[in-house]
Amino acid sequence: MNQEDNTGGGGIFGLFKWTKDALFGTDISPSMKYKDQEERRDRSRYAQDDTNFSMKFGNDSNRRSTNLSRSNSWSGLDSTLHRKYELLPEYNENGFNSIVNGDHHSKERIRSLRSPAPIVPREPLRNEPTDTFGHRLHTKRRTINELSNSQIPFIPPQEDDPLLSKLFNKDGVNEVRRSPYKLSVKDIPGKFPSPLTKRDEIDNYYVRDEDACHKNREYKKAYFDLFAQMDLNSRDLEDLCEDVREQREQFHRNEQTYKQAYEEMRAELVNELKKSKTLFENYYSLGQKYKSLKKVLDQTISHEAELATSRERLYQEVDLKNFEIQTLKQRLSDLELKYTNLQIEKDMQRDNYESEIHDLLLQLSLRNNERKDTSAGSNIFSTGQYDRTPFHNGNDSYDSNSHSWDTDYLKNIDGFIER
């Protein structure tokens, strides 16, 4: 018993002590505790184990028994015990494990999953008797109303709990009920909350018949088998926790690997996005340049078409002008030829006219000379001078000042020449 108290509530001894206290240390038997308690608020009136010692009661809250402050395996219970020793990890609103997100409380809770339950008494530990059941014989019985103010609300077990299913097997209970004699709670070792109004019933405990003792031995054997199974379950649970821890470490390693790969992929994606952005900007700039060049090319093609049209029109005008020039040249050539012919003809006519005039003048001069000769017939030889015609004055050129001529006759001659 001392060895169990010194374990601090951990290991198989703490588990055994917890089970023993849960079975034999309550004011109400386990079968009566859950009987006819369908609602949760009714079940919460009863607390497990001897944690009722530290509950506060109404007006008698200052009244304490000197034998009620002993520490036990469940004296350290508070509202966070189930959260602390919960095997499954909690998840936040995003669905991720809170340990991964850096929850310090969850890390501490997971780290202490396999640690023994601490013994934290609600009052300072005193050097008092460690008898769990004997001190209750002389204490005042507490009522249900006093138990309703418990600081630790009762949490009913699950219906599929294998431990409770084996402890409270309905077949075994029905078998006991069908037996020819009814077993009293006093036939089972330990103290139960049944009212002990008569002391002689306790004194007559050792004189029950042998069948009841045999039943008690069978119950004890079942309890020890159950404890052995619980020991195996504890070992399996430790192995399972070790596997969970290893898997969690492997999960963290994989997560770190994935996170590093994600960071690398993200950095590479950012670089690719930057390159894509630069490429897109260059492509957009090139597209704008292409559009401007295409516009200039279209304008150039339009100008070239207009230039070709203008060139064609100019060529046509040049051809037309060349034709006109050729025509004018031909006409000019014809006119020059005609002018030349006319000039030649005019020169020839002038020469003819001059020749005729010369002949006429010569004839006229001869006639005048003959007339003069006729009028001065007798004295021709007496004059010593021979009158020559205007055309015979030394250089055979006509001298208009040497002799006077008939102007009317000459006018007629000039008019003939002009014609």
UniProtKB/Swiss-Prot annotation:
Where along the chain is composition biased (Basic and acidic residues)? 34-48
Could you state one GO cellular component term attached to this entry? Answer: cytoplasm
Q: Does the keyword Secreted apply?
A: no
Locate the region Disordered: 34-76
Q: Which Pfam families match?
A: BBP1_C, BBP1_N
Keywords (alphabetical) are: Coiled coil, Cytoplasm, Cytoskeleton, Phosphoprotein
Q: Where is the composition biased (Low complexity)?
A: 64-75
This protein's assembly is summarised as: Homodimer. Interacts with KAR1, MPS2 and SPC29.
Q: What family is reported?
A: Belongs to the BBP1 family.
User: Which protein, by its recorded name, is this?
Assistant: Spindle pole component BBP1
